[in-house]
Amino acid sequence: MLIPRKVKHRKQHHPRQRGIASGGTTVSFGDYGIQALEHAYITNRQIESARIAINRHIKRGGKVWINIFPDRPLTKKPAETRMGSGKGSPEWWVANVKPGRVLFELSYPDEKTARDALTRAIHKLPIKARIVTREENF
C-alpha cells in the first residue's frame, strides 16, 4: 500500500476542501484516465483496491499509472474515550483530491476493455468520476 517513507510531522491540520485542481488535469502518460468530479479524501486502501480492479481486468496487456499519492495523515481517537487529552493517533493516509484531477491513467490497445477496467475502478472510489481520453485534452 502507498504510504510515505518518512514525514517531518506525524500529524497535520485538515484544511477545508475548496477550489478546483490546477495541475494534473489532463491525461499525460496513457490513453485513458479517471478524472474526479468532486472533492474527497481518498485513502491508500481505496487507491490500492482500484489499482487491483484495473489490473485484474486488463490482465497483462496494458500499463497503469497512479497519479495521486496519499501524503496526508488522518487521525482518530479510540472508541469510548473522553474529550480532550490531545489529538488522536494517525489512522489512515489519504490523498486530497480536487475536481478535475486525473487519478489513474491506462494505456491499452482495446478501447472497450480499457473503459470497462476504468469503470470497475471508479466503483471502488468514494467520489463521482468520469473516464477521459487523451484526445479530449486538445
From Swiss-Prot:
GO terms for cellular component: cytosolic large ribosomal subunit. It comes from the Bacteria. Transmembrane segments: none annotated. Residues 1-23 are annotated as: Disordered. The keyword RNA-binding applies. GO terms for biological process: translation. SUPFAM superfamilies: Ribosomal protein L16p/L10e. PROSITE patterns: RIBOSOMAL_L16_1 (PS00586), RIBOSOMAL_L16_2 (PS00701). The keyword Nucleotide-binding does not apply. GO terms for molecular function: rRNA binding; structural constituent of ribosome; tRNA binding. Binds 23S rRNA and is also seen to make contacts with the A and possibly P site tRNAs. Belongs to the universal ribosomal protein uL16 family. Part of the 50S ribosomal subunit. This is Large ribosomal subunit protein uL16. It comes from Mycobacterium sp. (strain KMS). The lineage of its organism: Bacteria, Bacillati, Actinomycetota, Actinomycetes, Mycobacteriales. The gene is rplP.
